[in-house]
Amino acid sequence: MKKPLPLILDTDIGSDIDDSWALAMILKSPELDLRLVTTTAYNIPYQTKVAAKLLEAAGRTDVKLAPGRGGEPALDSVAEWVGDYDLTSYPNLLDNAADAIIDTVMNSDEKITILCIGCFKNLADAYEKCPEISKNSRLAVIGGNIYNGACNGWHPALSGEWNIRCDLDAWRRGIEKTDWEVELLPLDVSGGVLLDTPYFEKVRKAGENDPLIRELVASNDVWFRTENWNYYGPTSPLFDTVGVYACITHENLNFQMLPIYANDESVSLIDPERGKMMNVALTWDDKERFYKFLTARLCGEI
């Protein structure tokens, strides 16, 4: 077996529920060596509690956890599930996400992958403070919408994807204008990804004997009620799990090197003059194969 991939997760967990699914998927994946989780974008104390509670449920309080910069309106969709969790009880809580990213990367003997599944404030802050981190790390990024190929009509073509649109300046400072090697997972592959009811029910059943999956499902059910989602159907879109999958394997995904530039409307364009070269996932070979993998991985079958 290959040595596990050293990983940092930079996440806006606690808003859409897919970040929680992505964190659970990481924690269930022996191919990944999670060393740090950083929170970004919204209500940072609440979001950091969400991450801490899931890490604790998995028995992984060895993973360092660092709050980043917020500023946008709070999206506390699973606050009922978080309850009165005491963040000060988390044993590896650090002070600052940007500093934690820098320290983790610069003190590593191996190149680290930073999986970015939220806005890019922490990356921008870390890179501006220490550009040298790009030499010992690479980025895997959920963001953009290139051809709108997998969105099934629910996301308009030539429109800005949220992780870029929520802070275009952070995207430019943290991604486009950096020396980082970038692997991009746009909506073309991460959009329209959801587990149909039989798969979801299998994950729900696994939670009866697995503390992490039990807490994931419990938080998901709170999110459903808060967001008035169809409670007894499939999952909501699980965009960020595609980023985790790409960190594990490139099998089943088709990539192409493209110069990507986000214009002032946050639309991702293929632009040879202004774009940054990125390895972009554009299509699936078999999306059903991914669904089977995700379900089996969360259920502890593989």
Residue ranges and their predicted role:
Residues 1-302:
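N-terminal acidic, glycine/proline-rich low-complexity segments
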